[in-house]
Design a protein with these regions (language model features):
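Feature marking well-ordered beta-strand scaffolds used for ligand recognition
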Residues: 1-427
Length: 427
């Protein structure tokens, strides 16, 4: 199957698919999309996204998801700055600014797009007014004094919750910022683990908050890298307090814990690591379903099975494709009514393994029930950056409340999909 739009410069080929259909594809002007967010204004559905290999952001009208339309693109900082991450809520857009090639992978910064001849970058988080959805207006800029921010959380209201590299720290910590006056954002509190401050001895494995610091009521769920999964009590936002911490030991890449998402109604959480090294050179990565019935004692109930290629595939293992193979992002609703809740069906991007869908009704026996894997990209959409082999690298995912699935890849544009399998309920 091949789908292209009038705006597309290349088509998307379907290599494997089960219980997932291809709805549309848009090249976004050869700008691979990464983190996505959404708002609905006056009956129109707007998707906001940052990009790999390009500084700045794009707004896509997906009111008709079968015909996505780019309605605005604007530039961000031009030198050595990632603008990958976005959040939208209550008419505000939060965009992260971060030095390309941070502490995690400094030896390969150039492969991520860092230009060593210009050793400067922009950092922090920008606050925009998007009540007029096609006319973003900059309201304020929170600066960290360090490398900037990565994956942040904002669901509306007074506070944004940042995974921030602050001045004096080796890696990302948790920072709560008051944006009631967006022109003058103000830090309220911060929380870090042992060894992150530069004036204290480093730990053997440096921890860093990947984020987002996912807030559910008065709890903040922190995917804290090699420090594991951290749960904080933020009933007093000026004094975050540790509730529990779950170690993943030596499992996973150098990244460690990548995502920690609560499923409040089920007293569960989803914990993931992220594949970092190509050609399966990480310690085994995992996605675990956690029992949170006693929040002071998190307990892993099961680990999702590793994807196996179908008979449609031309290889016996995704690790043979090259690039990265392993978990990356899951859909996170961020308490937005335009986004789908996470119920009994878990959606997960898996780099070379494409998109994987899991039935998690029985948390002790999760099973894969669907997938979508594209063919190899037909061209690189930037200089010869990562992956070193031109293969699919599904990165991020967002699902709207209508059931349409949006995914991004390092060398593809926006792909729109739809689940066609049985209704598992719980959403």
């Amino acid at each position: 199957m091949t789908v292209a739009t009038a705006q597309s410069t290349s088509a998307l080929r379907v290599h494997e698919s089960k219980n997932v259909e291809l709805v549309a594809y848009h090249s976004l002007g050869k700008r691979p999309n990464f983190k996505m967010a959404m708002q609905v204004v006056a009956g129109r559905w707007y998707l906001y996204t940052g990009h790999f290999w390009h500084n700045g952001w794009t707004i896509v009208d997906v009111t008709d998801p079968y015909r996505p339309e780019v309605v605005k693109q604007w530039e961000g900082p031009k030198v050595n700055t990632w603008t990958l991450q976005v959040q939208v809520a209550e008419g505000k857009l939060i965009t992260a600014l971060e030095k390309i090639g941070t502490w995690l992978d400094p030896g390969r910064a150039a492969l991520w797009g860092f230009d060593p001849s210009q050793p400067t970058w922009e950092e922090g988080a920008l606050i925009w007014d998007v009540k007029s959805p096609l006319e973003p207006r900059l309201l304020g800029h929170f600066k960290t004094g360090g490398f900037g921010t990565h994956r942040n959380f904002y669901d509306g209201g007074r506070y944004m919750h940042l995974a921030a590299n602050m001045e004096g720290y080796r890696s990302n910590i948790y920072v709560i910022v008051d944006i009631s006056d967006p022109a003058n954002p103000r830090e309220v509190s911060r929380w870090a683990v042992k060894g992150q401050r530069r004036d204290e001895p480093a730990e053997p494995q440096l921890a860093s908050l990947h984020g987002p610091p996912y807030v559910e009521g008065d709890r903040a769920w922190l995917s804290y890298g090699r420090a594991g999964a951290v749960l904080l009590d933020i009933s007093d936002v000026t004094r975050p307090r540790l509730v529990s911490q779950f170690s993943i030991g030596d499992f996973g890449s150098i990244m460690g814990c990548h995502t920690y998402l609560p499923l409040k109604e089920r007293k569960m959480a989803i914990l993931t690591t992220e594949a970092i090294l190509e050609d399966n050179r990480d310690s085994a990565n995992l996605v675990a379903l956690m029992d949170m019935s006693d929040e002071t004692k998190p307990r892993a109930m099961s680990i999702l099975p590793t994807p196996i290629p179908s008979e449609q595939a031309s290889y016996s293992s995704y690790a043979q494709r090259g690039g990265k193979f392993g978990p990356h992002n899951i859909h996170m609703p961020h308490h937005q009514s335009c986004l789908a809740k996470v119920g009994n069906l878990l959606h997960l991007t898996y780099f070379a393994g494409g998109l994987r869908l899991y039935d998690i009704r029985d948390p002790y026996q999760p099973r894969e029930i669907g997938y979508f894997v594209p063919g190899d990209p037909q061209e690189r959409l930037a200089r010869p950056y990562l992956p070193t082999k031109l293969v699919p690298q599904y990165e991020d995912i967002l699902i709207d409340s209508r059931g349409f699935i949006y995914v991004g890849d390092r060398n593809y544009g926006l792909t729109v999909l739809r689940y066609t399998g049985p209704d598992l309920g719980g959403g």
